[in-house]
Amino acid sequence: MTAKGQMLQDPFLNALRKEHVPVSIYLVNGIKLQGQVESFDQYVVLLRNTSVTQMVYKHAISTIVPARSVNLQHENKPQAAPASTLVQVETVQQPAE
């Protein structure tokens, strides 16, 4: 798993876990699982419903759909710049020799 993948997955799954958000998990074979994220690591997600906890391998997951929106802002991390922020990049060409 790339660092970028973990930077996206971990905060999302952790917010779902902490906020006890009900989720629907669609597997690559089309099966729909429902429950709450109990725990997760690099390879699996533990999904709890009323009767059982299931271990779902991440490579089998197609989509995770939360029942409501989740807040991914963290107090410890600086907030991203607003979308309207413009960055000017200046290029300087070296004279030909």
Swiss-Prot record:
Task: List, alphabetically, the GO terms of the cellular component aspect.
Answer: cytosol
One Pfam family this sequence matches: Hfq
Q: Give residue ranges for domain Sm.
A: 10-70
Signal peptide limits: none
Instruction: Output the GO biological process annotations, alphabetical, semicolon-separated.
Output: regulation of DNA-templated transcription; regulation of RNA stability; regulation of translation, ncRNA-mediated
A molecular-function term among this protein's GO annotations: RNA binding
Could you tell me the keywords of this UniProt record? RNA-binding, Stress response
HAMAP family, from UniProt? Hfq
What does the sequence similarity comment in the record state about its family?
A: Belongs to the Hfq family.
Q: What does this protein do?
A: RNA chaperone that binds small regulatory RNA (sRNAs) and mRNAs to facilitate mRNA translational regulation in response to envelope stress, environmental stress and changes in metabolite concentrations. Also binds with high specificity to tRNAs.
Subunit composition and interactions: Homohexamer.
User: What is this protein's record name?
Assistant: RNA-binding protein Hfq
The organism that produces this protein has a lineage beginning with: Bacteria, Pseudomonadati, Pseudomonadota, Betaproteobacteria, Neisseriales
Q: Which gene encodes it?
A: hfq
